Amino acid sequence: MDENDHDESRVALVSGGSRGIGAAVTTALTQRGCRVGCTYRTGRDDAEKIAADAPEQVLPIRFDLHDDTTAPTAVADLVSHWGHLDSLILNAGQWSGGRLVETDADAWWSVIETNLRGTVALARAALPHLVHGRSPSIVLVSSVVGVIGHAGDTAYAGAKSAMIGFGRSLAKEVARDGIRVNVLAPGFVTTDMTDAVPDSARRRIERETVLGRFGTVDEIAKAAVFLSEDATFCTGSVLTVDGGWAL
């Protein structure tokens, strides 16, 4: 199928789309009538469960953040299946905390590479297809800690801050191609990742958050869909959705 032979449905690719925020984004997009490539690395069963709920709209695709050679294949699989690509939501990532002086150097750099390498590789692979998309857009899911920093998160915050700089710079590069690039910076959200947060730290975060609670994946997904589908006059923006934690 030629990429100019678009049908009515928009096509999105969501990295890390089988769990947590990514799964909520995948579901929210299908509810909008989009068809979605939902990438996974180890969560194939999770991706297939999402696809079972919307078999005509969800395509599970394997993509390994640690191996950027899998990015072109992931994009090619989606375009081969549905003919074009309109939006890319770069959500896949990994958290690992710890004070800098107490963190092994290899482990520290692994967090940086895991969060950045696959993101950049997937964006690079998708751009030649996005230029043919309708109202094409890229959303990078960063973090509020990448905006203001957070003690004990130098690697994760460093990677997420780099995503913001990457996204804003890419927005300037591809604007002439009609591609919007925006960054979503969630605060603390209830996911498998934050289940590991100790109760004492959770209570402190809730006290620091103006709205007094962790966010939900559905709340973050709504913001991601807004940036991807509705924010047609936004590019290079950073949308913080953190319940007021950063105030």
What are these regions (language model features)?
Residues 143:
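Residue(s) in the substrate-gating loop at a strand-loop-helix junction
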